[in-house]
Regions:
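Ser/Thr/Pro/Gly-rich low-complexity linker/stalk segments immediately outside membranes or between
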Residues: 21-26, 50-71
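Secretory pathway targeting signatures of secreted, lumenal, and periplasmic proteins
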Residues: 69-127, 161, 167-169
């Protein structure tokens, strides 16, 4: 007895194929249907490749070319570079609603130290830095601290807040040392401040709050984006 040939095509319980259904219902030739499906599949595949390979909008790059050398990206629709104040290397600000954000870079000068700076000296220096911030911000509360990496820099980060009925301040300060001292040519203090009078961020303020954190995290030593 010969074996039955295997069934080719859709099983009966699944109904007719798409080309057969379109031909029976609307008179569309099967070759036309298959051609349209192939084009749609190709467009979808290209869209997936673009999504996976294209980076998100990077923002505007700003470079500090003299030591310490660094650059970062910021969203020009929400933030803008302003003149640095005394003791600062760079200042970027944004305003939306009642929210004000600031990203500030300052030079970091440490005493001579023979050991591992990031493990030995920075935590001690960070404690003193936190004490200084506590004197400036009433209601200062240190919410977290520890070693941190920001792209090609490693250091120690302090995260804190000062919440009062009339004013809220959320801050981050990271003391950064470049992986390659010849690239960064110096150490920095990278700071983020988000300040508004009372209440949590509104829906209109949330994009600035989010994008300012991304800009803070975009910091890199050197002039390239890696």
């Amino acid at each position: 007895m010969s074996e039955a040939a295997p069934r080719v095509g859709p099983r009966p319980e699944f109904g007719p194929s798409l080309p057969a259904w379109l031909r029976a219902r609307f008179g569309v030739p099967p070759l036309v249907t298959l051609g349209v499906v192939a084009v749609v599949a190709l467009v979808a595949a290209v869209a997936i490749v673009i999504t996976l390979s294209s980076p998100s909008a990077p923002g505007k790059q700003v470079v500090h070319p003299s030591p310490p050398v660094f650059n970062l990206l910021y969203p020009p629709a929400l933030m803008h570079r302003v003149a640095a104040r005394p003791g600062e290397l760079m200042r970027i600000e944004g305003h939306r609603g009642k929210l004000t954000t600031e990203i500030v870079v300052r030079p970091l000068k440490l005493p001579a130290y023979k050991g591992d700076v990031t493990h030995g000296l920075l935590p001690v220096y960070a404690d003193r830095f936190a004490d200084a911030q506590a004197k400036l911000l009433p209601g200062f509360l240190l919410t977290s601290e520890g070693r941190a990496r920001v792209n090609n820099g490693v250091g120690y980060e302090l995260v804190f807040q000062s919440v009062r009925p009339a004013r809220r301040v959320y801050g981050r300060d990271v003391l950064l040392v470049p992986d390659d001292i010849t690239e960064g040519k110096g150490l920095v203090i990278l700071s983020l401040r988000q300040t508004k009078p009372g209440g949590p961020f509104t829906k209109a303020e949330q994009p600035l709050a989010y994008q300012s954190k991304k800009a803070y995290r975009s910091f890199r030593f050197g002039t390239s984006r890696g």
